[in-house]
């Protein structure tokens, strides 16, 4: 029985990683840079349903950031592979641990972590790549613009996905 559970978690995480990477790369013109909105970030709600989403989201982010680096579609380069993916992974862990805190039935707090962590981390990495140091006014712009895109993806897309998964009972399969 334990092998069946392990296979299920590997499969779930792999499907989530693939979905994240594909959604990011299909829409790469709006997925990278100071003004960005990764629609794949709507998937950051999935740790509410399964811990497999933690590593799935992180791996999907690594894959999409790696492909963006080797194709020259990101200014953040290797830093985004390391720190952007780390921010996604930490946010996924936080989402998982706050999954039971609900406001009017919605995991609002769980969606705050991907927004704030990515705004701060990606905002800082973009600023350092652009300026060579942490210029606070540029950081504020980058963090706010990344955060705005994240907020759209997480609060609009993520919460819609949450309701769809919950309504269709797909969450019981995760």
What are these regions (language model features)?
Residues 2-55, 59:
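Hydrophobic transmembrane alpha-helices
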